[in-house]
Amino acid sequence: LRTKARKDGDDWIITGNKTWITHAARTHVMTVLARSVEGTTDYRGLSMFLAEKTPGTDATPFVDQGLSGGEIEVLGYRGMREYALQFDGMKAPADALLGGEEGQGFKQLMRTVEGARIQTAARAVGVARRAIELAFQYALDRKQFGQSIIRFPRVADKLAKMVTDMVMARELTYAA
């Protein structure tokens, strides 16, 4: 993690990058994990900040000084926009430090990861399901030797394996 936060009077100055911020352009507040404890290289030097920002628009997503970025093209995130951000001296007030104590950011982050992993699994199952639907339709529509290719054992077997794998993934996601 290369993003850093340093204290400057009553503010934190944040520099570095962050990737995978959902709805970053429109949000009023975002979480930022940054190294704030000087001389550390492991998780103990990381702190979490609740950084306020001015909501942007599609044309001008980031208007605050010290903050820029762009949208990331992603698969299966319909209706959710993901961004990569660059912090170039973005200011956050002293009370933006989540929990008020430096070095707790990694622990705070890990408490949120489990839910995010389940959400990612659910999204992947949805993408797989749609891919299977399209594959079935293609196998029905595509003719070879006067018949739909779904009638060929190798094609039917591959489609059956895809369905089996997707159902297993779905059930594991439900159980998570």
Regions found by a protein language model. Name each.
Residues 3-6:
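A structural signal for short hydrophobic beta-strand segments in well-ordered beta-sheet cores
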Residues 1, 28, 45, 81-83:
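Residues that flank catalytic or metal-binding motifs in active/ligand-binding sites
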Residues 65-167:
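Glycine-rich beta->alpha junctions and the first turn(s) of the following alpha-helix
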Residues 15-65:
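A short core secondary-structure module
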Residues 8-10, 35-39, 53-56, 88-95:
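Short loop segments at secondary-structure junctions
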Residues 9-13, 29, 82:
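A generic structural signal for beta-strand entry/edge sites
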